[in-house]
Amino acid sequence: DYVTDEGVQIYGGMGFSADAPMDRSYRDARINRIFEGTNEINRLLTVDQLLKRAMSGKIDIMSAAMAVQKELMSVPDFGAGEDEGVLTNELKAVRNIKKAILLVAGAAVQKLMNKLKHEQEILMNIADMIIDLYAAESSVLRLQKKIDTVGEEAADLEIQIVKTFISDAVERVNINGKHALQSFAEGDELRMMLMGLKRYTKLDPFNTKNARRAIATKISEDQGYKF
């Protein structure tokens, strides 16, 4: 949808015309926008269903959330000695995103209890964190399988795609987590949790500009997205 909107802008007034190449893409993009209403409902239901199962004892979220809170009181693990290949940083990021979600969701449940279901903004923040986790973990695991099959060199561009996505996802998780925490916590409690969130959304620097240029060049050469 973003690419379509940018394409329409590039062609200016002609962007909506059948004489320009963007008209079909713009019509197709309308389908996604119709789905957006349903997606908004599903975002709310994602967290709602998760919390209902936790409250009924079907899944144990609070124990994991309490473990994360306990970890915050310990000395940070800087990952010394960890080596999981080219995706070491990304695999660690996925694990930390899970902890960030548990930190925010656990604190929200403890603080708001049954009132949480009425706090749609907080539910949306947590849902967006979960969505980014799902996409991040899925992309990393899928890339791992490809690397095991064809090797790192053959999967170089896919590696850059995943690293770029993870970099963006971690930033979004940090922002959503921060907005959620600031909605129900304050004072020293808020400062402590924000420090914890920062700890779990820390990522080694990666040059996303060069990666995006390499990705764009490949797409331009192939005249399509062939990954």
Model-assigned labels for residue ranges:
Residues 1-227:
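Flavin-dependent oxidoreductase catalytic core characteristic
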